[in-house]
Amino acid sequence: MKIQVETVSPVERKVTIEVDPDRVAKELDRAYASLSRRVKLRGFRPGKAPRKVLERQFKAEVEGEVAERIVTETFTEAVRVESLPVVAPPSVSITDGVAEGKPMRYSARVEVKPKLEPKDYKGLEVTRKPPEVTDESVSAELTKIQDSMAQLVAVEGRFEAQEGDWAVIDHEGTIDGKPFDGSTAEGVTVKVAPGPITEGNVEALKGKKIGDTVELDEPFPADHRDEALRGKTAHMKVTLKALKVRQAPALDDALAKELGIEGVETLDALRTRIRSDLEKREKRRAESELKDALVKAALAKNEFEVPPALVERAIDTMIEGAAERFARQGIDLRQLQLDVSRMRADLREQALLQVRGALLLEAIADAEKVEVTEEDLEAEAARIADELGMPLAKVQQQTRGKDAREALKNRIREEKALSLLSSAATIQQ
């Protein structure tokens, strides 16, 4: 097999391969032998049909399958022999196809990681906002918890709706004089506030009394989930049936105990737990921002091309992550009818930065001969278990496979490279 590699760009190679006639012949022999055992031809027992007969009926199909197999096998061999850091499947163009007694020739264009020689990554100057937890931030978290436990209770001694109230309503609606799906309902709770009724707001109830009916025209947005309602305007009749307000529980030991947090029985204990959690969060925030600043500073001194396939893959991962987060909230991302092209365009800059950073850190780790030991892997597994609150044995099991283990090693190498940048940098607080 003859292999020729041309550099198209820093992130693309053209690989031209010529396959020996003998190898082509052997692959054809194997393909026809397999076909003979599988195919049923009139007048011949399985495995006994002459090759000439098979060629008359199946030549194009067999040669296509053989060409595909030869390309797959020989390209993989070429990548190994030439040590090509391939990042995506090749685009193949066959020059001379499969033919008895002749070599097969094809070319493959493929994206590769750029060869980097990182420079000026020591002595970076960055600014770091130190982690800080104040009494005010602890109180703000307590208020969030208090608000999350608020309940709607009936308004007493008042019958007129005020902005911010929650109203129990009956409603009926029409479009062009005809009812539509979901136009009639009873006992619906909405907020007396600005905004569309489709989002649970009816500002027109402000100043109305229980038993009053208001009429309003409600336009549906052009991207409404119900295609039949998009861009239409509904005439709605809304009757106020009852008024409620959100009532938050008192900030006391009873609230702390109701949360059911292990070891938290009093308000003081809850404050202590909140402060501890905020300190951990702030530490992670400060570390993350420092890492981002170090990577951006290093990238500013190292310009290089990035394989488009890696950027697209990073965008795919981001969208998959968003879908998983929505799914945990019971929302199917597909049902939101989002503009995927717009979403991908919005994520492209972030993905490009992520890929460039990862490639540069990998190159720095190579330049500094960073190694990952078994002790490093064990320590990282323990850290993950502690952070996620999972048993160590479960984390070890999940990271035992070849791919998972390799991903873990790459993450540790990246962290070690970042530590090198940090230790050699000038960091201003």
Swiss-Prot record:
Q: What Pfam families is this protein classified in?
A: FKBP_C, Trigger_C, Trigger_N
Q: What broad class of enzyme is this? A: isomerase
Membrane-crossing ranges are: none
**What does the UniProt keyword field contain?**
Cell cycle, Cell division, Chaperone, Cytoplasm, Isomerase, Rotamase
UniProt-listed Enzyme Commission number(s): 5.2.1.8
Q: Which GO terms describe its biological process?
A: 'de novo' cotranslational protein folding; cell division; chaperone-mediated protein folding; protein transport; protein unfolding
Query: What does the entry list under GO cellular component?
Result: cytoplasm
For whether the record's keyword set contains Signal, the answer is: no
Which InterPro entries does the record associate with it? PPIase_dom_sf, PPIase_FKBP_dom, Trig_fac, Trigger_fac_C, Trigger_fac_C_sf, Trigger_fac_ribosome-bd_bac, Trigger_fac_ribosome-bd_sf, Trigger_fact/SurA_dom_sf
Q: Where in the cell is it found?
A: Cytoplasm
So what does this thing catalyse?
[protein]-peptidylproline (omega=180) = [protein]-peptidylproline (omega=0)
Query: What family does the Swiss-Prot or TrEMBL record give for this protein?
Result: Belongs to the FKBP-type PPIase family. Tig subfamily.
Its biological purpose is as follows: Involved in protein export. Acts as a chaperone by maintaining the newly synthesized protein in an open conformation. Functions as a peptidyl-prolyl cis-trans isomerase.
Its UniProt domain note says: Consists of 3 domains; the N-terminus binds the ribosome, the middle domain has PPIase activity, while the C-terminus has intrinsic chaperone activity on its own.
**Per its UniProt record, what PANTHER family does this chain match?**
TRIGGER FACTOR CHAPERONE AND PEPTIDYL-PROLYL CIS/TRANS ISOMERASE, TRIGGER FACTOR-LIKE PROTEIN TIG, CHLOROPLASTIC
This protein is called Trigger factor
What's the encoding gene here? tig
